[in-house]
Amino acid sequence: MKAIILISEASLPLAKTLQRELPDTLIYTKNECEGCISITSCHRFIEEHFNDFDSIIFIGAMGICVRSIAGCIKNKYKDPAVVCVDSTGRFVISVLSGHVGGANELTRHIAAITGGEAVITTQSDNAGLWALDTLAEKYDWKITVPHAEMNRLVTLFVNREPTVLLLDIKDKGTEYLERTLPAHVKVFYHFEDIPQSLSLIH
C-alpha cells in the first residue's frame, strides 16, 4: 500500500494523477478534498503510520517531508520507501530506502508519469554500478552476511576497491553480472583459483 501525503490542495490534480497510475494508493491531506482521507497533522500521521505503508509519497516541500519522517527512521532494511515530489511534479526526489525499499525505482516511475526529473543520489546508481543490497531479492538469491557487513561491502564496492567475484553457479543473475562487470571486479569460477590475499564477495 502506498500513501500520498498532499501538503497543498493546489497539487490535488497531481495527486489524483499519481493515484490513478500507482496501484493501491491512498491520498491523505489536512485539506477537505473529495476522494482524499482527512488527517489532522501530517507529522502525527507519519509518526503513527510510518511502517503501515511500503511507500510514502510527499507532494510538497522537501523540508516538510524530512521533518515529518525524521523521528521514525530506523534503517534501510525496515524503513518504507519515501519519495518527495515538488508541487508541480517537476522534481521527484528519492529520500529514503532507495535500494532495499524501492524508492529509487518508484522515483523513476513517478518522474515518467509527471514528465519530471528523477533526483537520485545513491552512488551506485549514479556511477552505473550494481546495487549489491538488492541483487539477492532480484535474482532469488540469499544474503548470508549480517546487514552491517553487507553495508561495509557495499561501501568498498561503490568506492571501486578491487573486488573478487566468485561465480560457481550459472543463472540469469550471474549472466547479468558477467555482462555488466565493472573494471574493478575480477571474476573467478573456482574458489581454489582465488589468491588468498584477495577479498571475496560470494
PLM regions: where:
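N-terminal basic/disordered segments at the start of proteins
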Residues: 1-31
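Hydrophobic/aromatic-rich, well-ordered segments within soluble, folded domains that form packed cores
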Residues: 46-50, 55-84
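Internal alpha/beta core interface subdomains
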Residues: 100-196
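Conserved small/polar residues in nucleotide/adenosyl-binding loops
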Residues: 201-202
